Amino acid sequence: MSKKLTFQEIILTLQQFWNDKGCMLMQAYDNEKGAGTMSPYTFLRAIGPEPWNAAYVEPSRRPADGRYGENPNRLYQHHQFQVVMKPSPSNIQELYLESLEKLGINPLEHDIRFVEDNWENPSTGSAGLGWEVWLDGMEITQFTYFQQVGGLATQPVTSEVTYGLERLASYIQEVDSVYDIEWSPGVKYGEIFLQPEYEHSKYSFEISDQVMLLENFEKFEKEASRALEEGLVHPAYDYVLKCSHTFNLLDARGAVSVTERAGYIARIRNLARLVAKTFVAERRKLGYPLLDEATRVELLKEETE
């Protein structure tokens, strides 16, 4: 690697690459979430028959992973670059390796391994065949073929590529701490995110109001159900995301027991499944508008027979 790309140049390079491969460039979704997979641009669009190709950066919050800014690689919030393609291209792995070349990483000169790591997200009823991608001994990407999302089988199969941007940037810039990553010329990652990391960690582990969070979970759960009763998928899913983040805050605070934890996850999963089922039903009412006309007519005909 000759030129060491800044963090924002890595994002720009990936955006340009996947744009050229036919992906829409979406923007980060404005609700807290633990992973890019939970964005409606993946969770909802991975189900149903309509094609969908999108790429976006997603800040991902994981309260239990906060370390007050003292750990060089573990963060309350990190950034993922998410690529989702449906139906999955037959050459998706080759496209991924090509994207690494655009970042200055020649696959022929590095030890790049696809290590089997089947993926599951119990809180959304989602699972798939997956691999971790290791670059010279460090995991930089999660690669998944979705089999189930929101409790529904995915057909056609959706492929997901999730780059861990901090890890990728640490490797490209040859730094040991994420806080030393150059975000833009002359500006370090730590100058932007070290204080928020400390403050969010302190809040998550020490300050958050457990009673308020428990009450909020109940309110968000009820509101999600109420929205679903009206067939309002997207507002309902917003409240599912709020339930998920609230649960993660409770979990980080140690406010839920092992038994209670399983119960909360099941409650979120039940809502997510209802959202998924309702979304597909609503898209069908619209006549699956993203399908080409011939496929759309044939599919609607089959479903009415």
UniProtKB/Swiss-Prot annotation:
Pfam families: tRNA-synt_2e (PF02091). Keywords: Aminoacyl-tRNA synthetase, ATP-binding, Cytoplasm, Ligase, Nucleotide-binding, Protein biosynthesis. InterPro entries: aa-tRNA-synth_II/BPL/LPL (IPR045864), Gly-tRNA-synth_heterodimer (IPR006194), Gly-tRNA_ligase_asu (IPR002310). The keyword ATP-binding applies. Gene3D superfamilies: Bira Bifunctional Protein, Domain 2, Class II aaRS and biotin synthetases, domain 2. Its EC number is 6.1.1.14. Coiled coil: none annotated. It comes from the Bacteria. PROSITE patterns: AA_TRNA_LIGASE_II_GLYAB. The keyword Ligase applies. It catalyses: tRNA(Gly) + glycine + ATP = glycyl-tRNA(Gly) + AMP + diphosphate. One of its GO terms (molecular function) is ATP binding. GO terms for cellular component: cytosol. It is found in: Cytoplasm. One of its GO terms (biological process) is glycyl-tRNA aminoacylation. Tetramer of two alpha and two beta subunits. Belongs to the class-II aminoacyl-tRNA synthetase family. PANTHER family: GLYCINE--TRNA LIGASE, CHLOROPLASTIC_MITOCHONDRIAL 2, GLYCYL-TRNA SYNTHETASE. This is Glycine--tRNA ligase alpha subunit. The gene is glyQ.
